[in-house]
Protein backbone atom coordinates (compact mmCIF):
# COMPACT_ATOMS: atom_id res chain seq x y z
CA UNK A 1 0.00 0.00 0.00
CA UNK A 2 1.38 3.37 -1.04
CA UNK A 3 1.39 5.89 1.82
CA UNK A 4 -0.49 9.17 1.36
CA UNK A 5 0.75 12.57 2.51
CA UNK A 6 -0.93 15.80 3.50
CA UNK A 7 0.89 18.94 2.38
CA UNK A 8 0.54 22.71 2.62
CA UNK A 9 1.97 25.08 0.03
CA UNK A 10 2.51 28.78 0.74
CA UNK A 11 1.84 31.22 -2.11
CA UNK A 12 3.69 34.48 -2.75
CA UNK A 13 0.82 36.39 -1.10
CA UNK A 14 1.20 34.23 2.05
CA UNK A 15 -1.89 32.06 1.57
CA UNK A 16 -1.79 28.35 2.42
CA UNK A 17 -3.07 25.70 0.02
CA UNK A 18 -3.81 22.22 1.42
CA UNK A 19 -3.64 19.02 -0.62
CA UNK A 20 -2.93 15.29 -0.51
CA UNK A 21 -0.70 13.08 -2.66
CA UNK A 22 1.35 9.90 -2.72
CA UNK A 23 4.46 11.80 -3.88
CA UNK A 24 4.94 15.24 -2.34
CA UNK A 25 7.93 16.29 -4.49
CA UNK A 26 6.22 15.30 -7.76
CA UNK A 27 3.02 17.10 -6.78
CA UNK A 28 4.94 20.21 -5.67
CA UNK A 29 6.72 20.30 -9.05
CA UNK A 30 3.36 20.00 -10.82
CA UNK A 31 2.08 23.00 -8.87
CA UNK A 32 5.30 24.94 -9.62
CA UNK A 33 4.97 24.29 -13.36
CA UNK A 34 1.31 25.38 -13.44
CA UNK A 35 0.01 21.87 -14.06
CA UNK A 36 -1.40 21.38 -10.56
CA UNK A 37 -4.48 22.85 -8.93
CA UNK A 38 -6.06 25.86 -10.63
CA UNK A 39 -6.12 27.62 -7.26
CA UNK A 40 -2.32 27.92 -7.39
CA UNK A 41 -1.89 29.02 -10.99
CA UNK A 42 -0.55 32.56 -11.32
CA UNK A 43 0.08 32.88 -7.58
CA UNK A 44 3.80 33.59 -7.93
CA UNK A 45 6.51 31.69 -6.12
CA UNK A 46 5.28 28.64 -4.22
CA UNK A 47 6.95 27.16 -1.15
CA UNK A 48 6.32 23.75 0.36
CA UNK A 49 5.46 24.75 3.93
CA UNK A 50 4.49 21.41 5.49
CA UNK A 51 4.13 17.74 4.65
CA UNK A 52 3.43 14.65 6.73
CA UNK A 53 2.48 11.04 6.06
CA UNK A 54 -1.12 10.28 6.98
CA UNK A 55 -1.71 6.66 5.95
CA UNK A 56 -4.21 5.52 3.34
CA UNK A 57 -6.22 7.61 0.88
CA UNK A 58 -9.36 7.58 3.01
CA UNK A 59 -7.55 8.96 6.03
CA UNK A 60 -5.72 11.49 3.83
CA UNK A 61 -9.01 12.80 2.45
CA UNK A 62 -10.45 13.18 5.95
CA UNK A 63 -7.27 14.90 7.20
CA UNK A 64 -7.32 17.28 4.21
CA UNK A 65 -10.94 18.19 4.91
CA UNK A 66 -10.22 18.78 8.61
CA UNK A 67 -7.14 20.95 7.91
CA UNK A 68 -9.10 23.01 5.38
CA UNK A 69 -11.58 23.78 8.19
CA UNK A 70 -8.82 25.26 10.39
CA UNK A 71 -8.35 29.00 10.74
CA UNK A 72 -5.31 30.66 9.17
CA UNK A 73 -3.77 30.98 12.64
CA UNK A 74 -4.23 27.25 13.33
CA UNK A 75 -2.71 26.36 9.95
CA UNK A 76 0.27 28.61 10.69
CA UNK A 77 0.78 26.79 14.02
CA UNK A 78 0.62 23.48 12.17
CA UNK A 79 3.28 24.69 9.72
CA UNK A 80 5.53 26.18 12.41
CA UNK A 81 5.27 23.51 15.09
CA UNK A 82 3.25 20.61 13.74
CA UNK A 83 0.88 21.70 16.51
CA UNK A 84 -2.08 19.41 16.89
CA UNK A 85 -1.34 17.23 13.86
CA UNK A 86 -0.89 14.00 15.83
CA UNK A 87 -4.14 14.66 17.68
CA UNK A 88 -5.94 15.42 14.43
CA UNK A 89 -4.80 12.11 12.91
CA UNK A 90 -5.67 10.23 16.06
CA UNK A 91 -9.20 11.66 16.08
CA UNK A 92 -9.69 10.59 12.47
CA UNK A 93 -8.56 7.03 13.18
CA UNK A 94 -10.90 6.53 16.13
CA UNK A 95 -13.62 4.14 15.01
CA UNK A 96 -17.13 5.51 15.09
CA UNK A 97 -19.66 3.37 16.96
CA UNK A 98 -23.06 3.27 15.32
CA UNK A 99 -26.10 3.28 17.55
CA UNK A 100 -29.31 1.58 16.49
From Swiss-Prot:
- This protein's source sits in the domain of life called Bacteria
What SUPFAM superfamilies does its record include? GIY-YIG endonuclease
- Do you know which InterPro entries this protein is assigned to? GIY-YIG_endonuc, GIY-YIG_endonuc_sf, UPF0213_domain, UPF0213_GIY-YIG_endonuc
**Which SMART domains does this entry report, sorted A to Z?**
GIYc (SM00465)
Q: Which PROSITE patterns match?
A: GIY_YIG (PS50164)
One Pfam family, short name: GIY-YIG
Q: Where in the numbering of this chain does the GIY-YIG domain appear?
A: 2-77
Q: Which PANTHER family match?
A: UPF0213 PROTEIN YHBQ
Which HAMAP family has this protein been placed in? UPF0213 (MF_01029)
Give the protein family.
Answer: Belongs to the UPF0213 family.
Entry protein name = UPF0213 protein YhbQ
Q: Which organism is it from?
A: Escherichia coli (strain SMS-3-5 / SECEC)
Amino acid sequence: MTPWFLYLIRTADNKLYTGITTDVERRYQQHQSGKGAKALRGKGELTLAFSAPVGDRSLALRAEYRVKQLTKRQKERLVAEGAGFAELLSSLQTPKIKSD
